[in-house]
């Protein structure tokens, strides 16, 4: 006992020293600015900090590749499908078409005897259409439904403690006795909905799968996740490959689709190699039920800065598994399609909300670095502090550099994006990943200020979420983007004014013209390819019924 405690203390000290040393090392490399390669007039340079970032991308891609090889090898691994599984679907003001597709995909799941529990966040007449769709698709004679005035934590109008207790017991009994059940309950947010499903199921099943009501599951998705959990008893949770259902509906959903593939099949695949996936996404995840009930109450009652948390439910659920020392994994063999915002403002609000939960959970996650591989500490430091280094670089270039420095920065952003997307194209076997290089512009222009705004408003959760039946447009997300564009525009004007005081040399003019032409050609080429792709694939997708998950 004393020996284990001593080893734990040593690991805490070791991981803390490693994380601090890594951050100080990166900061020193950034401040010193040592250059390996440097041309005359600083037209091009490659320094220590750039070398570190390049090495990170290479190492991350390598481990992702190795993890995908492991996934392919496990494809032939036979398993006994004798463990009980329950699928929990969280629904809130869902688009009827998406909900119907979701439930139809649930009926096609190949895992035998899977229990389905859908909980609707809201019990008003306006929410009844979701229960009707559930009964229609799952079969009125094969499913149970219940309109609950309460939820497990709040009483409805006119309810007493006794009636609340009786109704809670009725919900639990209904869930346990039915193969498919739909519960409408008093509004309380997604976490309340998930809690109802977890609480009602109790310890009656071995594994709990989570799913959102806008998600279409691949028939083999449950089987593939069960396979991962069965292979290693120290794996507490596993997530699958989330693809975009409405990728051709707008430019923002298309770029999100390539970003999703990169996030899951490079970043999370790399994390999975070390058993420390940071977030098992809500559309497709599975947990050991025995672990789930060790922390479900603490997960529900999570507080931050004195307020109960109302977002970041899936990320905190993953962190709770990691906090117990269990591994979290990713498998590309389990797939699903899910809806993503097609309007820029709704996407921006979504990303801001996700950034809030990321930074909040980063602090919680740091307490468990010592229980996992050093890669978890390493990646947390790199991804957590990278936006701050990037902002410092941009402001410095735009206000203290030259016109060529700004142009070179833009070219470098696209070059790095092209290199990374080219590797992704090879790994996926699909040229569409080349458009990932366009996402880097979206990151620089919108995600970067959204992250800073998320930190500044991290304890505010009164905006950013809406159902899909009624889309709520919130313009507050434009504030940080507008401020960021003003800062950048001011830097460009200041640099041009400063440079205009001295006449450009002939060599400088040539470099600027060539650089501008290269940048313009890049955009013309990518935008042309985008238009061709949308005209070709967009029309085909409009008539597709999505009977199966397709990776196109």
Swiss-Prot record:
Via the strong production of high molecular mass hyaluronan (HMM-HA) may be in part responsible for the low susceptibility to cancers observed with those rodents. It is a multi-pass membrane protein. PANTHER family: HYALURONAN SYNTHASE, HYALURONAN SYNTHASE 2. It catalyses: [hyaluronan](n) + UDP-N-acetyl-alpha-D-glucosamine = N-acetyl-beta-D-glucosaminyl-(1->4)-[hyaluronan](n) + UDP + H(+); N-acetyl-beta-D-glucosaminyl-(1->4)-[hyaluronan](n) + UDP-alpha-D-glucuronate = [hyaluronan](n+1) + UDP + H(+). Pathway: Glycan biosynthesis; hyaluronan biosynthesis. Belongs to the NodC/HAS family. Residues 1-11, 67-374, 424-429, 497-510 are cytoplasmic. The modification Phosphothreonine is found at residues 110, 328. It is found in: Cell membrane; Endoplasmic reticulum membrane; Vesicle; Golgi apparatus membrane. It comes from Heterocephalus glaber. There is a cross-link at residue 190 (Glycyl lysine isopeptide (Lys-Gly) (interchain with G-Cter in ubiquitin)). This is Hyaluronan synthase 2. GO terms for cellular component: cytoplasmic vesicle; endoplasmic reticulum membrane; extracellular vesicle; Golgi apparatus; Golgi membrane; lysosome; plasma membrane; plasma membrane raft. Pfam families: Chitin_synth_2 (PF03142), Glycos_transf_2 (PF00535). GO terms for biological process: atrioventricular canal development; bone morphogenesis; endocardial cushion to mesenchymal transition; extracellular matrix assembly; hyaluronan biosynthetic process; polysaccharide biosynthetic process; positive regulation of urine volume; renal water absorption. Homodimer; dimerization promotes enzymatic activity. Forms heterodimer with HAS3. Forms heterodimer with HAS1. It comes from the Eukaryota. GO terms for molecular function: hyaluronan synthase activity. Keywords: Cell membrane, Endoplasmic reticulum, Glycoprotein, Glycosyltransferase, Golgi apparatus, Isopeptide bond, Lysosome, Membrane, Phosphoprotein, Transferase, Transmembrane, Transmembrane helix, Ubl conjugation. InterPro entries: Glyco_trans_2-like, Nucleotide-diphossugar_trans. Catalyzes the addition of GlcNAc or GlcUA monosaccharides to the nascent hyaluronan polymer. Therefore, it is essential to hyaluronan synthesis a major component of most extracellular matrices that has a structural role in tissues architectures and regulates cell adhesion, migration and differentiation. This is one of three isoenzymes responsible for cellular hyaluronan synthesis and it is particularly responsible for the synthesis of high molecular mass hyaluronan. Residues 33-45, 396-402, 451-475, 532-552 are extracellular. Glycans are attached at residue 221. Its cofactor is Mg(2+). Overexpressed in skin fibroblasts. Phosphorylation at Thr-328 is essential for hyaluronan synthase activity.
């Amino acid at each position: 006992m004393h020996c284990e405690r001593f080893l734990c203390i040593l690991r805490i000290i070791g991981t803390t020293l490693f994380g601090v040393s890594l951050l100080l090392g990166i900061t020193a490399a950034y401040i010193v600015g040592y250059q390996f390669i440097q041309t005359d007039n600083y037209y091009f340079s490659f320094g220590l900090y750039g070398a570190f970032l390049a090495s990170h991308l290479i190492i991350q891609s390598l481990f992702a590749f190795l993890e995908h090889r492991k996934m392919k090898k496990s494809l032939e691994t036979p398993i006994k499908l004798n463990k009980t599984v329950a699928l929990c679907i969280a629904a809130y003001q869902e688009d009827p078409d998406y909900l119907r597709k979701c439930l139809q995909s649930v009926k096609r799941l190949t895992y035998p005897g899977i229990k389905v529990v859908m909980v609707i966040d809201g019990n008003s007449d306006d929410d009844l259409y979701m229960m009707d769709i559930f009964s229609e698709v799952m079969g009125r004679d094969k499913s149970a439904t219940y309109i609950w005035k309460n939820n497990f934590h709040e009483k409805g109008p006119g309810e007493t403690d006794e009636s609340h207790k009786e109704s809670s017991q009725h919900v639990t009994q209904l869930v346990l006795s039915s193969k498919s059940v739909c519960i409408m309950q008093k509004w309380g947010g997604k976490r309340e909905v998930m809690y109802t499903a977890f609480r009602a199921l109790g310890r009656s099943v071995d594994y709990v799968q989570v799913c959102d009501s806008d998600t279409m599951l691949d028939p083999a998705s449950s089987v593939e996740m069960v396979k991962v959990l069965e292979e290693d008893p120290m794996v507490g949770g596993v997530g699958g490959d989330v693809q975009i259902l409405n990728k051709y509906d707008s430019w923002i959903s298309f770029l999100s689709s390539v970003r999703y593939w990169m996030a899951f099949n490079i970043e999370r695949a790399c994390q999975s190699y070390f058993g420390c996936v940071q977030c098992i996404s809500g559309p497709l995840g599975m947990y050991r039920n025995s672990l789930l009930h060790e922390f479900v109450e603490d997960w529900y009652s999570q507080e931050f800065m004195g307020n109960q948390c109302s977002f970041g439910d899936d990320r905190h659920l993953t962190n709770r598994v990691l906090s117990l020392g269990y591994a979290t994994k990713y498998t590309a063999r389990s797939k699903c399609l899910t809806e993503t915002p097609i309007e820029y403002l709704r996407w921006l609000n979504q990303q801001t909300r996700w950034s809030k939960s990321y930074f909040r959970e980063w602090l919680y996650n740091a307490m468990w670095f010592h229980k996992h591989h050093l890669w978890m500490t390493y990646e947390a430091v790199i991804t957590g502090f990278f936006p701050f280094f990037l902002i410092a670089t941009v402001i410095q270039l735009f206000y203290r550099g030259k016109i060529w420095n700004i142009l070179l920065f833009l070219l470098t952003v696209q070059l790095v994006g092209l290199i990374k997307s080219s590797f992704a194209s090879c790994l996926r076997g699909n040229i569409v990943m080349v458009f990932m290089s366009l996402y880097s512009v979206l990151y620089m222009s919108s995600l970067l200020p959204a992250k800073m705004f998320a930190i500044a408003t991290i304890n505010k959760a009164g905006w950013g979420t809406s159902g899909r039946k009624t889309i709520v447009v919130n313009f507050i997300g434009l504030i940080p983007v507008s401020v960021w564009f003003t800062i950048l525009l001011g830097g460009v004007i200041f640099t041009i004014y400063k440079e205009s005081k001295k006449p450009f040399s002939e060599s400088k003019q040539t470099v600027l013209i060539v650089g501008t032409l290269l940048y313009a050609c890049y955009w013309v080429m990518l935008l042309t390819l985008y238009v061709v792709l949308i005209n070709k694939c967009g029309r085909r997708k409009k008539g597709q019924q999505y009977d199966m998950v397709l990776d196109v």
